[in-house]
């Protein structure tokens, strides 16, 4: 009996497409998805009993591996005392204090329930603070399913081949300007034309939602310069790369200070969580201190805060975790490039720490959305199916990142490279 198929087919009766997030349907690779039952460390198991070495890690959050003992212990302890109050708790103070005291450029922070909430709230705050309306986002960058961001977005929008999104009125996107990632001149032209109306720039400082694309430090400095010149705010969307490329996130890669930063994924320890923070003078514009209103019944939920606190504290106290991830990440990157060269496969590997994408292309580098769109989707599909059959859970999309955890070992990397070597292209 194929339990995966049975469960997925029944799910289609009750959930649109059988899923609660489109990329999980595996529509772009043409097969039914495995239905996951359990996970431990770097391994997951589906309903048919098949085991996989997991390079998706819940799309990034599980940097400590699945069911980390300390995170599970924290969740159990808190759940015996509280589930939800809709009131202040010491746990939310403990996490907020840890984040503000150990991260750069975060004087104050506000907890929310998802990355989407964090980014949409940060943009609202930027508009309220500057008294301006327009926001620059970059083609291929995904900042959640907020109406104003669903234009030339990455992630599932790109995976599913959706040109935009039905249900988003023109009115909702009229103040969204599209920049080209790593193109200084084009962004400068946007400011020359709209500068007095631009509230801010929101950017993934390491893009992960069009696949991993690194930001040129020179480009990032130009963004800071333009924001300072025109009185706009620079917002780092570190929902994916925060606590992943380094404990302090992508800010460590640039000699640039953002005005606001958004977090999610890792900071929730695998539970629904998000946050946005920044300079005190900006954050104090939030209600109840200021006129920018944002609220949430489940924001700062005690169980989520306990999972986040256990995760963030463990990462902060163990910098060697990042050394390990860099070591195995470097081995994986070098290994696949050597194999591809030997086989004559056109391949670009973009990696930053524990996030990485294999782009099947004859380009020498992949540095923006237009480059990503030229990559060979059919070859990626063959590669994905090959690796899945070999026991590897990787993203079912050319336009997503693979992730590494502290539980991945050199043996896991060796097995991946062995499987990749048998891929015929």
UniProtKB/Swiss-Prot annotation:
GO terms for biological process: protoporphyrinogen IX biosynthetic process. Disulfide bonds: none annotated. One of its GO terms (cellular component) is cytoplasm. The keyword Transmembrane helix does not apply. Keywords: Cytoplasm, Isomerase, Porphyrin biosynthesis, Pyridoxal phosphate. It holds the Pfam family Aminotran_3. GO terms for molecular function: glutamate-1-semialdehyde 2,1-aminomutase activity; pyridoxal phosphate binding; transaminase activity. Its cofactor is pyridoxal 5'-phosphate. InterPro entries: 4pyrrol_synth_GluAld_NH2Trfase (IPR004639), Aminotrans_3 (IPR005814), Aminotrans_3_PPA_site (IPR049704), PyrdxlP-dep_Trfase (IPR015424), PyrdxlP-dep_Trfase_major (IPR015421), PyrdxlP-dep_Trfase_small (IPR015422). Pathway: Porphyrin-containing compound metabolism; protoporphyrin-IX biosynthesis; 5-aminolevulinate from L-glutamyl-tRNA(Glu): step 2/2. Gene3D superfamilies: Aspartate Aminotransferase, domain 1 (3.90.1150.10), Type I PLP-dependent aspartate aminotransferase-like (Major domain) (3.40.640.10). It catalyses: (S)-4-amino-5-oxopentanoate = 5-aminolevulinate. Its EC number is 5.4.3.8. It is found in: Cytoplasm. Homodimer. Belongs to the class-III pyridoxal-phosphate-dependent aminotransferase family. HemL subfamily. This is Glutamate-1-semialdehyde 2,1-aminomutase. The lineage of its organism: Bacteria, Bacillati, Bacillota, Clostridia, Eubacteriales. The gene is hemL.
């Amino acid at each position: 009996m194929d339990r995966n198929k049975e469960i997925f087919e029944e799910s289609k009766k009750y959930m649109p497409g059988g899923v609660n997030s489109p990329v999980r349907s595996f529509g772009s690779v043409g097969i039914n998805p495995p239905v996951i039952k359990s996970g431990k460390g770097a391994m997951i198991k589906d309903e048919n009993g098949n085991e996989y070495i997991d390079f998706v890690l819940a799309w990034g959050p599980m940097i400590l591996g699945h069911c980390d003992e300390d995170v599970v212990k924290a969740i159990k302890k808190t759940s015996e005392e509280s589930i939800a109050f809709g009131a202040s708790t010491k746990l939310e103070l403990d996490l907020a204090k840890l984040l503000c005291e150990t991260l750069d450029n975060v004087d104050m922070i506000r907890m929310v329930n998802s990355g989407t909430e964090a980014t949409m709230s940060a943009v609202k705050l930027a508009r309220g603070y500057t008294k301006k309306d327009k926001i620059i986002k970059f083609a291929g960058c995904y900042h959640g399913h907020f109406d104003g961001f669903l234009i030339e977005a990455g992630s599932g929008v790109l995976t599913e081949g959706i040109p935009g999104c039905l249900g988003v009125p023109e009115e909702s996107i009229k103040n969204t300007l599209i920049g080209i990632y790593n193109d200084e001149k084009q962004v400068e032209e946007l400011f020359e034309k709209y500068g007095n109306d631009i509230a801010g720039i929101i950017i993934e400082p390491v893009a992960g939602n069009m696949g991993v694309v690194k930001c040129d430090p020179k480009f990032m400095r130009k963004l800071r310069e333009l924001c300072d010149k025109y009185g706009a705010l620079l917002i780092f969307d570190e929902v994916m790369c925060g606590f992943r490329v380094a404990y302090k996130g992508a800010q460590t890669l640039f000699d640039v200070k953002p005005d606001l930063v958004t977090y999610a994924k890792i900071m929730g320890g695998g539970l629904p969580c998000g946050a946005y923070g920044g300079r005190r003078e900006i954050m104090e514009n939030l209600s109840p201190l200021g006129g920018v209103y944002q609220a949430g019944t489940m924001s700062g939920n005690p169980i989520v805060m306990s999972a986040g606190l256990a995760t963030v504290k463990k990462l902060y106290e163990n910098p060697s975790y990042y050394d390990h991830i860099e070591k195995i990440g470097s081995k994986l990157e070098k290994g696949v490039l050597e194999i591809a060269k030997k086989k004559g496969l056109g391949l670009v590997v973009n990696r930053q720490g524990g996030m990485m994408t294999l782009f099947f292309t004859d380009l020498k580098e992949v540095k923006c959305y237009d480059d990503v769109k030229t990559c060979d989707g059919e070859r990626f599909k063959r590669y994905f199916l090959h690796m899945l059959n070999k026991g590897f859970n990787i993203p079912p999309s050319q336009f997503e990142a693979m992730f590494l955890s502290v539980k991945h070992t050199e043996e896991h990397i060796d097995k991946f490279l062995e499987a990749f070597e048998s891929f015929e292209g």
